From Swiss-Prot:
Predominant cellular place of this UniProt entry's protein: cytoplasm
Name this polypeptide is given: Testin
Organism: Ovis aries
Residue span(s) of domain PET: 92-199
UniProt-listed GO biological process terms: negative regulation of cell population proliferation
Name of the coding gene: TES
Residue ranges of domain LIM zinc-binding in the record: 234-297, 299-359, 362-421
Description of its domains: The N-terminal and the C-terminal halves of the protein can associate with each other, thereby hindering interactions with ZYX.
Length: 421
């Protein structure tokens, strides 16, 4: 498919998750409705990950596409119908007998994802070493956490041009080259092993604790492997604490066999969240999630959340923006050359600010213009004018004077306060 055809085919899938309730806003949100180019709900302004959207197949497609054309193709399967790669995530089901008064019942626990290891006991140990609220048990807080991190850490629009808004053919080509590069140079999947098993990794290479190199060792020289294992001390690359014997550890191939992590320490160096499904990006001695690796390579538009591949973009309020996306957060009007106010780190045009966000003057009961001086005390505000900031009893101007506040009123003296009480 040529670039022109790809551009024409692009769309944001606006029907996906339509009407899903917001888990954050509850009944305040009318239901999920994707904004035309922002990755948020038009009704409540929360992200799709904050809504109860059923995305299991879509997320599996996204991760499957991420692993396509990499060494991790064993983790994907191609659908017979359309050839789309699907992520073969490992689901672990544990059954535990529960003693009852008359008979024994079976308690089943399903993990929506588990490390793809042959030893289920090792996978179970791994799960137990994660914080309980982050264990992806079906229907639990941990499963919701995993779903949210899949959306945040691995945005589809960081790897698939068709998920982006109106890219030019040149931008599509640059993005495809960028994705190909990070797949070959940074992308990896952690592996769970017992630390003592690390000695068997690599061609005739032995792990040297605390070192940054490996040495070639003749097999015959290993007189007492078990004794060597007992003497070895392994420490976590993140927290520097030692690994307990028999506890599972994570290693990242791109980091080298001399580095191990506790399961709960295998986190992004920027957001410090667990790397979802142990999918990592390695750069300059640090682990990153997909989002923050891409942020370290390319500017990201604060409006549409997409990476910027154009040479022309704007910077404002310590953020980057596509020229067409530096818009009012409320009405989407372009703000270039216009007066705007930052509200919760989002730019809002002056008319929308006055209409939706401006504080109301206690004196005249009108909205206070963002460019006008004001007097604020606790949660109350006044125009800093001789017409508004007045004694609530005698109407004396209080600008530059001492005053006595009582809820939304101000007084120039005890006498005036008593007269109004």
């Amino acid at each position: 498919m040529d670039l022109e055809a790809k551009v024409k085919k692009m769309g944001l899938g606006h029907e996906q998750g339509f009407g899903a309730p917001c888990l954050k806003c509850k009944e305040k949100c009318e239901g999920f409705e994707l904004h035309f180019w922002r990755k948020i709900c038009r009704n409540c302004k929360c992200g799709q990950e904050e809504h109860d959207v059923l995305l299991s197949n879509e997320e599996d497609r996204k991760v499957g596409k991420l692993f396509e054309d990499t060494k991790y193709t064993t983790l994907i399967a191609k659908l017979k119908s359309d050839g789309i790669p699907m992520y073969k995530r490992n689901v672990m089901i544990l059954t535990n007998p529960v003693a009852a008064k008359k008979n024994v019942s079976i308690n089943t626990v399903t993990y929506e994802w588990a490390p793809p290891v042959q030893n289920q006991a090792l996978a179970r140990q791994y799960m137990q070493m994660l914080p309980k609220e982050k264990q992806p048990v079906a229907g639990s807080e941990g499963a919701q956490y995993r779903k949210k991190q899949l959306a945040k850490q691995l945005p589809a629009h960081d790897q698939d041009p068709s998920k982006c808004h109106e890219l030019s053919p040149k931008e599509v080509k640059e993005m495809e080259q960028f994705v190909k590069k990070y797949k070959s140079e940074a992308l990896g999947v952690g592996d769970v092993k017992l630390p003592r098993d690390m000695n068997t990794q690599g061609p005739n290479k032995m792990y040297i604790p605390g070192g940054d190199r490996s040495t070639t060792t003749a097999v015959g020289a290993m007189e007492d492997k078990s004794a060597e294992h007992k003497r070895t001390q392994y420490s976590c690359y993140c927290c520097k604490l030692s690994m307990k014997e028999g506890d599972p550890a994570i290693y990242a191939e791109r980091a080298g066999y001399d580095k191990l992590w506790h399961p709960a320490c295998f986190v992004c160096s920027t957001c410090h969240e667990l790397l979802v499904d142990m999918i990592y990006f390695w750069k300059n001695g640090k682990l990153y999630c997909g989002r923050h690796y891409c942020d370290s390579e390319k500017p990201r538009c604060a409006g549409c959340d997409e990476l910027i591949f154009s040479n022309e973009y704007t910077q404002a309020e310590n953020q980057n923006w596509h020229l067409k996306h530096f818009c009012c957060f409320d009405c989407d009007n372009i703000l270039a050359g216009e007066i705007y106010v930052m509200v919760n780190d989002k730019p809002v045009c002056k008319p929308c600010y006055v209409k939706n966000h401006a504080v109301v003057c206690q004196g005249c009961h009108n909205a206070i213009d963002p460019e006008v001086q004001r007097v604020t005390y606790n949660n109350f505000s006044w125009h800093a004018s001789t017409e508004c900031f007045l004694c609530s009893c005698c109407s004396k101007c209080l600008i530059g004077q001492k005053f006595m506040p009582v809820e939304g009123m101000v007084f120039c003296s005890v006498e005036c306060k008593k007269m109004m009480s």
